[in-house]
């Protein structure tokens, strides 16, 4: 009889332990989803504040929508950061679709920011030192630049010519565009991303690590 009650008590204890685990799981995931939604909305709003870096190619613009994505990387992980980036891109597609140009450019922007975030997280996420931040920023900038050269060559330039009536190869010259505009633009963009996030992360670090 004693062993029976002991077994029942143990089973009840295990049941409440399982309930506690599931409660914590749902509370944690609800909190996580709320942060991702908020960061995605902020990232979308930051898309409206963009500026050109190269006067001869004023259609190549940089914005700071990556900053909330990097905050998600700090608070959670790489997958959550990509989730913020994806939701931001969907909001852009649904609420501020600029036609063929946006339809062509948005996937490229997603890839560009995604590879930059991955490069930064590869060195910096597990061990957040200044050295690893610099290494991650350099890797992210290189990956960003290479990805944009390749995607412009095989994807964007042909599609802009076909659907947006803008043949970059004819007006500027393909290789001149790639190496005199795309490469320096993305190198500068990676540098701007790295410096901007470092500047906001320093004062916010004590807050972000507690979230």
Swiss-Prot record:
Q: What is the protein's membrane topology class?
A: Multi-pass membrane protein
**InterPro entries tied to this protein:** ECF_trnsprt_substrate-spec (IPR024529), RibU (IPR025720)
| Primary localisation category | membrane
What cellular-component terms does GO give this entry?
plasma membrane
> In its keyword annotation, does this UniProt entry include Cell membrane?
yes
Where is it localised? Cell membrane
Record key words, sorted: Cell membrane, Membrane, Transmembrane, Transmembrane helix, Transport
As for family, the record states: Belongs to the prokaryotic riboflavin transporter (P-RFT) (TC 2.A.87) family.
Q: Report quaternary structure and partners.
A: Forms a stable energy-coupling factor (ECF) transporter complex composed of 2 membrane-embedded substrate-binding proteins (S component), 2 ATP-binding proteins (A component) and 2 transmembrane proteins (T component) upon coexpression of the 4 components in E.coli.
| Job of this protein | Substrate-binding (S) component of an energy-coupling factor (ECF) ABC-transporter complex. Mediates riboflavin uptake, may also transport FMN and roseoflavin. Probably a riboflavin-binding protein that interacts with the energy-coupling factor (ECF) ABC-transporter complex. Unlike classic ABC transporters this ECF transporter provides the energy necessary to transport a number of different substrates. The substrates themselves are bound by transmembrane, not extracytoplasmic soluble proteins. Expression of the complex plus RibU in E.coli allows riboflavin uptake.
What is the protein name stated in its UniProt record? Riboflavin transporter RibU
Origin species, per record, is Streptococcus thermophilus (strain ATCC BAA-250 / LMG 18311)
Name of the gene encoding the protein in the UniProt record: ribU
